[in-house]
């Protein structure tokens, strides 16, 4: 039973996490361009800011997870907040922003700014849940007898996620704001549901102990190397 639960958690969280990353990596630049007429400079700024957010989050939250000796809470609640942050993109539309902020002269410019900020927030939760803690949970939950198999399954998920996303979004018109709203509601809802399931399905790895107070800075320095 525990073995089946482990593989179920691995496949579910790895696949859903990679689906969310594919949407972020492949579609956000298209979204900000079509919906808010973003310039190449603004698109580059969004990519750079989210990359910095992902790197710093993985380093510092990963070390914090080691320090506290906790994986489940970071993963489950991280996926829940990750889903909520994706859902927020469903409400980023030029017409809605213009109606909500009538005093703003350029709703598209405000929209670009909000997309960049929300992307960093989404990346923070995604990197917390998936990059920093889920991958650590996978290592903690395996040993020499099954780690290679588990890592192999985890490694193939980015490719499978690309097929899922591109195959599942063939209906979408990237110039239609309503289609973006539907897409973000679906992806955000699935990630949110995944996090809720994690509260029940994920088990803390055996032998994972809370570390001494001085270990946090040492872990951060180690991860930076």
Regions found by a protein language model. Give the residues of each.
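Helix-loop junctions on the cytosolic side of multi-pass membrane transporters
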Residues: 94-97, 199-213
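Intracellular juxtamembrane helix-capping segments at the cytosolic ends
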Residues: 28, 127-142
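C-terminal ends and interior cores of transmembrane alpha-helices
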Residues: 77-109
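Symmetry-related core transmembrane helices of the 12-TM Major Facilitator Superfamily/SLC fold
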Residues: 181-200
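Central cavity-lining transmembrane alpha-helices of secondary-active solute carriers
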Residues: 43-65, 84-85
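Juxtamembrane intracellular "pre-TM" segments in multi-pass secondary transporters
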Residues: 1-4, 206-225
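Glycine-rich segments within core transmembrane alpha-helices of 12-TM secondary carriers
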Residues: 53-55, 148-173
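Helix-loop boundary and gating motifs at the non-cytosolic
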Residues: 1-54
């Amino acid at each position: 039973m525990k073995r089946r639960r482990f593989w179920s958690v691995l496949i579910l969280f790895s696949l859903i996490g990679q689906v969310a990353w594919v949407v972020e990596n492949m579609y956000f630049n298209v979204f900000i361009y079509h919906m808010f007429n973003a310039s190449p400079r603004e698109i580059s700024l969004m990519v750079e800011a989210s990359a910095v957010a992902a790197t710093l989050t993985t380093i510092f939250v990963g070390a914090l997870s080691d320090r506290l000796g906790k994986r489940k809470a970071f993963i489950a609640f991280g996926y829940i907040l990750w889903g909520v942050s994706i859902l927020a993109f469903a409400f980023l539309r030029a017409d809605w922003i213009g109606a909500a902020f009538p005093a703003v002269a350029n709703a598209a410019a405000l929209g670009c700014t909000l997309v960049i900020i929300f992307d960093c927030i989404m990346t923070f939760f995604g990197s917390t849940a998936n990059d920093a803690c889920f991958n650590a949970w996978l290592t903690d939950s395996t040993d020499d007898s099954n780690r290679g198999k588990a890592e192999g399954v985890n490694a193939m998920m980015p490719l499978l996620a690309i097929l899922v996303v591109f195959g599942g979004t063939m209906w979408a018109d990237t110039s239609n704001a309503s289609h973006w709203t539907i897409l973000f509601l679906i992806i955000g809802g699935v990630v949110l549901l995944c996090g809720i399931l994690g509260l029940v399905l994920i088990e803390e790895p055996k032998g994972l102990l809370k570390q001494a107070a001085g270990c946090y800075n040492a872990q951060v320095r180690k991860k930076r190397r």
